[in-house]
Design a protein with these regions (language model features):
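Glycine-rich phosphate-binding active-site loops on the catalytic face of alpha/beta enzymes
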Residues: 94-106, 168, 188-189, 198, ...
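Short, acidic/polar
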Residues: 27-38, 82-90, 143-153, 196-204
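Conserved anion-binding
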Residues: 16-18, 79-182, 186-191
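Structural motif
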Residues: 41, 67, 94, 157, ...
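N-terminal amphipathic alpha-helix/helix-capping segment at the start of soluble metabolic enzymes
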Residues: 1-35, 122-128, 170-176, 200, ...
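C-terminal helical cap(s) of enzyme catalytic domains, especially alpha/beta-barrels
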Residues: 110-119, 219-241
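Generic structural signal for hydrophobic
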Residues: 38-39, 64, 91, 154, ...
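Conserved beta-strand positions in the central sheet of alpha/beta enzyme cores
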Residues: 21, 44-47, 72, 100, ...
Length: 241
């Protein structure tokens, strides 16, 4: 039975908020904080990507944590292992909850990120973040062989989770049933797909085993962002049963 949207008019319970990541794909911290504040009753995780981090740096992470969000630092680190390790260490010391590292460079590269972010958090007296391996971007078409190989890299490197499209979840869960799965490209039915080649509805993603849904333009560029957030929270609640 569909959840009653009116139950979520003032916000969503933590069990739903913790599974919804708000993509703050803007280039200034003032705008990011304004958007985040307005939608915080429904979203418990703030995604700080390359655009916002390039504009505001560590301040973006610190501001979102200070405002009460978990931070998903979506930086897709891809460099030599030493550099990845050092960058991840910095992000861990800032208190991020999630950090993305690209799987393309292989196990050593991923392991450097896993160890770096954990060491940075430990040195700062903070809980260990979840290092997420980026598999195949949702703006790309999937290659099954590459996907399976990259999921294997995630497991071998000790990553706590990965980022994949909803359409890849069945493959991912068969190989790595216990990792945290983060799914971007979420679009409620009837909303444009923008540049996402493999979008999914919240219902479909949850049913396929997604743990965290990343939602950006479907809410931030909606005619009524609050109404869009309420609808998504209600849809997730229905999917969770």
């Amino acid at each position: 039975m569909p959840a009653d949207k009116s139950e979520f008019s003032d916000g969503a319970p933590e069990v739903i908020r913790s599974r919804l990541a708000l993509a703050l794909d803007v280039d200034d911290i003032v705008t990011a904080r304004r958007i985040a504040h307005a939608l915080q009753p429904w979203f418990g995780v703030a995604k700080v990507g390359l655009e916002l981090f390039s504009a505001a740096g560590p301040e973006a992470v610190e501001a979102m944590i200070g405002d009460g969000f978990e931070v998903f630092a979506d930086l897709k680190l891809l460099d030599i292992p030493t550099t990845v390790n050092k960058a991840a260490r910095v992000m861990g010391s800032l208190g991020v909850s999630y950090l993305t590292v690209h799987t393309r460079a292989g196990v050593d590269h991923l392991r450097a990120g896993v160890e770096g972010v954990a060491d940075g958090a430990s040195a700062a007296g903070l809980p260990a973040p979840t290092c997420l391996g980026i598999t195949v971007l949702t703006s790309e078409q999937a290659d099954l062989v590459a996907l399976e190989q990259r999921v294997g890299f995630v497991l071998d490197a000790g990553c706590g989770g990965l980022v994949c499209s909803a359409s890849d979840l069945s493959t991912v869960r068969a190989i790595a049933p216990n990792v945290v799965t983060v799914v971007p490209g979420i679009r409620p039915a009837g909303v444009g797909v923008d540049d996402q080649a493999r979008p999914s509805t919240p219902t479909s993603a949850i049913a396929s085993g997604a743990d965290v849904l990343v939602i950006g333009r479907a809410v931030t560029r909606a005619e009524d962002p609050i109404s869009a957030a309420i609808s998504i929270a209600a849809e997730v609640a229905s999917a969770l049963g």
